Design a protein with these regions (language model features):
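Fe(II)/2-oxoglutarate oxygenase catalytic core
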Residues: 1-105, 109-119, 190-198, 203-247
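Hydrophobic side chains in beta-strands
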Residues: 73, 108, 132, 145, ...
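Short histidine-centered beta-strand/loop micro-motifs
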Residues: 96, 115-122, 141-143, 169-171
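Residues that flank catalytic or metal-binding motifs in active/ligand-binding sites
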Residues: 102, 124-126, 175
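Conserved beta-strand residues within beta-sheet cores
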Residues: 103, 116, 127-129, 165
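Short, conserved beta-strand element in jelly-roll/cupin
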Residues: 108-110, 121-137
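Catalytic core of Fe(II)/2-oxoglutarate
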Residues: 137-223
Length: 247
């Protein structure tokens, strides 16, 4: 089994794994491609309805101009909103068959814009892009993982390991929209809760505690204790929170 790598660990990702994956190796994703005509209208209607609700995404400072925006419904195993599930029941029905789904969002990249090179949070997931509105293919619009470029196609999955440095661009005159989901890789599936809790712990510490002077000045020992406390709370609370929201 490969080891789990985390961006926030500070360790160098070894880059000894596949950059891209093929959807025909994942039956539950292939089913969605087969039913694309059935779910296309549902997704496009929802995107039109929520057009003004997309939020600028500046993860790792790669989107300073604000041309990359998203609507997030599930974030590292935590359900932020069940609106997608209510408004897109057909799509949701097929998504339920995907093991290890931990993140779900809609991503829009404006015309004549790009997302700078960056790495994802961990190699424990497979990032999956389903093309919804794809104005054109390579070389004008595409994704680069490592040194390999691929274009999106409407109704087709583009699957990749976002622990690799990757970037995206859209040099066309129209916006590009994809459905993004992250699913825990099969070999790490038994560690799903731990993976989600750990990444959420990094988020809490970096975005909340990390900016406070007392925490910044605290010893490595104290920081480890705080990490352990936050991790334990999230490890227990996150599944309970989701149970309450879906019951």
């Amino acid at each position: 089994m490969k080891e789990i790598w985390y961006y926030e660990s500070g360790n160098t990702y070894p880059e000894n794994e596949s950059k891209y994956y093929e959807s025909n190796g994942f039956p539950q994703l292939a089913i969605i491609e087969e039913h694309w005509t059935e779910i296309k209208e549902e997704l496009k209607n929802f995107i039109e309805e929520k057009d003004r609700s997309f939020q600028s995404n500046n993860y790792q400072g790669v989107n300073i101009e604000g041309n990359w925006s998203s609507l997030t419904f599930v974030f590292w195993g935590s359900m932020l909103s069940n609106e997608f599930h209510k408004k897109c029941p057909i799509t949701t029905c097929y998504l339920k068959g995907i093991k290890g789904l931990v993140s779900l969002s809609l991503s829009r990249l404006s015309a004549h814009s790009s997302i700078a090179r960056h790495r994802g949070d961990t190699n424990a997931i497979m990032r999956c892009h389903l093309g919804i509105d794809v104005p054109t293919g390579l070389p004008q619009c595409g994704l680069k993982v490592g040194e390999e470029e691929r274009g999106w196609q409407e109704g087709k999955w583009t699957l990749f390991n976002d622990a690799y440095i990757h970037s995206a661009w859209n040099n066309s005159d129209k916006g590009r929209v994809v459905l993004i989901l992250d699913t825990i890789r099969l070999e790490f599936l038994n560690k799903k809760n731990s993976i989600c809790a750990r990444i959420l712990t990094y988020q809490v510490i970096n975005n909340k505690l990390g900016r406070k002077k007392p925490f910044k000045k605290s010893s490595f020992f104290v920081k480890n204790i705080v990490f352990g406390i936050v991790f334990t709370i999230l490890y227990i609370y996150r599944p309970l929170q989701n149970f309450i929201k879906t019951s």
